[in-house]
Amino acid sequence: MRAKGKLGTWILIVSLFWGGGSAPAADTLRDIRVLSQDARAYITPEGAEQMRNAAREQDRQDARYNEQFFAPWRQTQPRHGVEEIVRAFRRCLNRPGYADNGRRHAPEWIEGLQASAQFETYPNARYAGMTTRRTDVRILPTKQPRYADGNTSPFDLLQETLLPVNTPVFVVHETRDKAWLLVETAWTVGWLPAEDVARVDETLIRSWESGPYVTVIRDRVPVYGVEGGAFLFDASVGAMFPLAKVREDGWEILVTVPDRGRRGVVLTAFADRAAVERKPLPLTPENVAGQINTLIGGPYGWGGMHGNRDCSATLRDLFAPFGIWLPRNSMEQARQGGGVINLKRLDAGAREAQIASRGVPFLSLLWEPGHIMLYLGRMHGEICVFHNFWSVKARDRKGRVRKKVIIGRAAITTLHPGREFQKKGLRTSDRLRELWAMTLLPPAL
């Protein structure tokens, strides 16, 4: 009986630990429970008409997308000077941060990385390349993380972004041991493991630039070699490839793989029909909503950590299949095109009126410093947005965090997520009041 009592006590402790003692689940956020998480529910006849008008501009935008995508292959010199690259090392040297074991990095660690970068020879590479797998762009040439603190921060501050497989790059510089390459793409700059990049020649470049193209519309799509059927890599939403042949069961596409000397070789590969479409995917409300639904629930990943997406990567990948080019950074996305509407100096009511009267559902970005969202329209009288975000915090009158709900995924919410926690003197951030700008994407101008 005594043993049974101990077992019962143990079960109770475990249940409290995993149940009542744990952080609230993402679906405890009222917006996510109440609002439809099916983007098709936000399509209206008026919004559909606005998008049909915008679709007339799509071919021009798609041509611009392709031009930007391949731009690194036409570079002969780096766009970023050595001082700009060295500045990242200096910032980290002043604040080395913490390692994944919770201990503070030694300044000597940063100094060693800078010495290995041999900046006295910058730029020592200067050639065209292509990624041969999905790969992380790092701010410093290391896979070791740098956290803001040793206990609670889940974000690696050395993570810049994630590059899809078969992304054109301009290789600017290499470390002394040749293990890391500093590369530029049309939307980022940073360090890649040399094993993830192949050098490409003019013949390969021509085979890629000639088109036509297909675009991936699902995540983690396996790609196989046509000869032998070997698995080559997986590709995710927004990746693009030259089309070789249409088959009843799928698509034959051209892909780049490395040879033993890490030079790029073009192979014919195969991808499933349901996961790939011709690029650009027609710009219709149904297609945009379908792509949102593909991304809904996708885990949040700071800078693309673990192959996931943050707010700006989510929107960039959402619009890539449609041939609509977006930069990688949320601030740069907000400056995209010429349709930027300043909301900063307006009160909350005037901001809401501007969004309702001038916003084009599914083609308007709402930006606040550090975060970006897609305007979907209204439901239950409220402005609704699609975005990927980490958490909602409730603070007391002194600004101290008293409640934090981890969302950590892409979802549809109002501009007031978490307002149900605004009680007993607590307040949550009001995204409507924090908005600085609304941007109409180029097709909607």
Model-found features: residue ranges?
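Bacterial N-terminal signal peptides
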Residues: 10-19
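Conserved beta-strand/loop element in small beta-rich adapter and peptidoglycan-binding domains
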Residues: 152-175, 229-247
